[in-house]
């Protein structure tokens, strides 16, 4: 084995690419490392196409092995299971920039597998996996129009930082990943702390410029270690079949794409498609339906794109920069903590916000360490939202990705835990969909959070932009429909406040998207966002002053950290009885901060009073009401403030001589006692003699009564 190694500097890190020693039966395999974070990436490509295959079957799998961080998996089976949400998101991050670089008509099955085998807690594996995938595909010889580069851009002290460490990312106002070829940006995924459009674009350009180092290094690596390029030729178009489909369908499709209502339009298009298939297969039974459908779909694209480039109205009759009609309702679900329905044209999201306590936080065990997530965002896309039937079950990759994008859009305006001590969960149920459902989720989430009384810093809105480009002509579209997303050249989603951008996601299917085009798209998106925010502010101008009556209220008090063990009790008995008897939940921090969550304020006050009793200091000379807990021959034990026990000696029970303790006291009896002494070991000596004359008067345990003469 003679491994081939390529090493280069990338920002502050050293990247190493190695091939030829491991997984030699795969089409290509690369061990990619960046400062001890190592990802092993393999590519397997089938030489033959499956019979009847009419799409490109690319699969990207990203998997993290716990041994990479020197850990053993938890759970009963002690091995890795199904992909986590983080693994799914990184698999999508790898997939999105490489998929557009395979030629049209290439239907050979390809599987990319990225396995994290070593991890430096300061270096995130996602970037390493993207670089490794780019290198492996370039070495494999498949018709891949790469390589791609990938860069992470941070923004610290008003300076862009290339590939910041995990520690630096905590100080950064931006987390942006950009991928592209030597000529063009293909993918952007980002989260920002309200930056301007100009700053976001500058970050994209900066990242694309810096990643040229990776692209050049991969090209040099491929010259030395690459396999011969596949002798693949794109299938020749069947001009006779194309002309037949055009003759039957072109005029009718033109009319169908003037129907503004989605379901009616789809019914008409399906009828035309069925007619085209029936007519052509009747003439020649050997022609496959899939080839007819491919030509039919291409014709649809030509019609829609041609009209947009020519300046004609869009599918639903709008101009290029018009946002669909908006409809907003808040407080729609009576027993939830906050809710809203956001409707934009034929896209609708029901967003619901729920407030919880710290124990509801999600504990995420990542390779780079364990962390707690206090803001949860879940996106559901049921089949009925597009008028279809289908499986209902665990979230798919798309739902996880859309949920994360929407969360990124809202995260920047969420209050800190110190400002608002609640765990917040938002669920977006997509009830109708015709494009831009993730951005509808951002708008709906912002409204639901304000309805729940969450003091977000500002309202957030999101908008999806599209692009149609033919040679030098291009048109940027605001608030794209599902069809415009499918038939266009760019999907460009922007979320933000009136002050700036909180999230940007970009997927570009073609080369030639210049910074100038991106700037136009960003400016047009800003205009649309301001319009949407204006309508949202009319519905609910600010967060509600108070949280829902059905939400838990969190009360905070401080105790001496030395007293924490007293509140918890032996084996947790004390705190357990407090929560069970009052229906509250209690969390105690190491610094003595006690957080009590209760729907009923009286229950919370009751618990706070009882905790104050438990932690209260017993004062010598003070009189307390106590309860007899047990009897002995030499006296009685009495629980006073905070269930602290003291001894009333038999000689201190009454003025007269006491022969038998049980003649005077019984277990459970309430008596007034005075603290005579607290010795060095903390033992309390009590007396029932020399008390105030009115025995039955209850003594406030928080304000001990002074000894009376």
Curated annotation (Swiss-Prot):
Per its database record, what is this protein's job? Involved in mRNA degradation. Catalyzes the phosphorolysis of single-stranded polyribonucleotides processively in the 3'- to 5'-direction.
> What GO molecular function annotation could you give as one example from this UniProt entry?
polyribonucleotide nucleotidyltransferase activity
The family note in this entry says: Belongs to the polyribonucleotide nucleotidyltransferase family.
> Where is each S1 motif domain found?
621-689
Q: What is its cofactor?
A: Mg(2+)
Presence of the UniProt keyword ATP-binding in the record: no
Give the protein name, as stated in the record: Polyribonucleotide nucleotidyltransferase
* Record Pfam families: KH_1, PNPase, RNase_PH, RNase_PH_C, S1
* Catalyzed reactions: RNA(n+1) + phosphate = RNA(n) + a ribonucleoside 5'-diphosphate
Q: Cite the binding residues for Mg(2+).
A: 485, 491
Residues annotated as transmembrane:
none
Report the GO terms under cellular component.
cytosol
BP GO terms, sorted: mRNA catabolic process; RNA processing
Subunit structure of this entry? Component of the RNA degradosome, which is a multiprotein complex involved in RNA processing and mRNA degradation.
So what EC number does this one have? 2.7.7.8
């Amino acid at each position: 084995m003679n491994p081939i190694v390529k090493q280069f500097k990338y920002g502050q890190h050293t990247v190493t690419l190695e091939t030829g020693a491991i997984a030699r039966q795969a089409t290509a395999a690369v061990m990619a490392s960046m400062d001890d974070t190592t990802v092993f990436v393999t590519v397997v490509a089938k030489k033959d196409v499956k019979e009847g295959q009419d799409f490109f079957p690319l699969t990207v799998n990203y998997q993290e092995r716990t041994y990479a961080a020197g850990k053993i998996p938890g759970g009963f089976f002690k091995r890795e299971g199904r992909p986590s949400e983080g693994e799914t998101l990184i698999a999508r991050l790898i997939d999105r920039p490489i998929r557009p670089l395979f030629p049209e008509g290439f239907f050979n099955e390809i599987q990319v597998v990225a396995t994290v085998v070593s991890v430096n807690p300061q270096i995130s594996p996602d970037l390493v996996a993207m670089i490794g995938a780019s290198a492996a595909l370039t070495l494999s010889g498949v018709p891949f129009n790469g390589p791609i580069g990938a860069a992470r851009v941070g923004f610290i002290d008003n300076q862009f930082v290339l590939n910041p460490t995990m520690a630096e990312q905590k100080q950064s106002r931006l987390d942006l990943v950009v991928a592209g070829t030597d000529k063009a940006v293909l993918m952007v995924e980002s989260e920002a702390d309200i930056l301007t459009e100009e700053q976001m674009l500058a970050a994209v350009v900066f990242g694309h410029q810096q990643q040229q180092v990776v692209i050049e290094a991969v090209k040099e690596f491929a010259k030395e270690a690459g396999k011969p390029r596949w002798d693949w030729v794109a299938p020749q178009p069947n001009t006779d079949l194309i002309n037949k489909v055009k003759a039957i369908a072109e005029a009718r499709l033109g009319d169908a794409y003037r129907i503004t209502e989605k379901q009616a339009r789809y019914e008409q298009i399906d009828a035309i498609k069925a007619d085209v298939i029936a007519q052509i297969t009747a003439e020649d039974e050997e022609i496959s339906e899939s080839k007819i459908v491919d030509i039919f779909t291409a014709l649809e694209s030509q019609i829609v794109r041609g009209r947009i480039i020519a300046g004609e109205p869009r599918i639903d009759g709008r101009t290029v920069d018009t946002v669909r009609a908006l409809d907003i309702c808040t407080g729609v679900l009576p027993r939830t903590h906050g809710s809203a329905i956001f409707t934009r044209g034929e896209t609708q999201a029901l967003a619901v916000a729920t407030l919880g306590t710290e124990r509801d936080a999600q504990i995420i065990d990542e390779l780079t360490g364990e962390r707690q997530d206090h803001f949860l965002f879940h996106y559901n896309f049921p089949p009925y939202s597009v008028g279809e039937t289908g499986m209902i079950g665990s979230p798919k990759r798309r739902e996880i990705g859309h949920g994360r994008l929407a969360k990124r859009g809202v995260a920047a305006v969420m209050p800190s835990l110190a400002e608002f001590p609640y765990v917040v969960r938002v669920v977006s149920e997509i009830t109708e969909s015709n494009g831009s459902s993730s951005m509808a989720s951002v708008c709906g989430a912002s409204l639901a959070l304000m309805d729940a009384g969450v003091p977000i810093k500002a309202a957030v809105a999101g908008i999806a932009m599209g692009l149609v480009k033919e040679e030098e002509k291009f048109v940027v579209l605001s608030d794209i429909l599902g069809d415009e997303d499918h038939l266009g050249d760019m999907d460009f989603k922007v979320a933000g406040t009136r002050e700036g951008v909180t999230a940007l996601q970009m997927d570009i299917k073609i080369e030639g998207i210049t910074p100038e085009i991106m700037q136009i798209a960003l400016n047009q998106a800003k205009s649309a966002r301001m319009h949407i925010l204006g309508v949202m502010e009319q519905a609910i101008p600010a967060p509600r002053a108070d949280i829902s009556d059905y939400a838990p209220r969190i009360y905070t008090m401080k105790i001496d950290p030395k007293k924490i063990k007293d509140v918890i009790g032996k084996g947790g008995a004390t705190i357990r009885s407090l929560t069970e008897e009052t229906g509250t939940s209690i969390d105690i921090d190491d610094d003595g901060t006690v957080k009590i969550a209760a729907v009923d304020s009286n229950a919370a006050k009751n618990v706070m009073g009882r905790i104050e009793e438990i932690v209260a200091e017993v004062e010598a000379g003070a009189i307390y009401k106590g309860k007899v807990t047990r009897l002995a021959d030499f006296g009685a034990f009495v629980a006073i403030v905070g269930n602290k026990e003291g001894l009333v000696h038999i000689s201190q029970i009454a003025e007269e001589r006491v022969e038998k303790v049980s003649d005077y006291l019984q277990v459970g009896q309430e008596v007034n006692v005075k603290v005579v002494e607290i010795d060095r070991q903390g033992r309390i000596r009590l007396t029932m003699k020399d008390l105030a004359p009115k025995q039955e008067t209850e003594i406030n345990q928080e304000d001990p009564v002074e000894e009376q003469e």
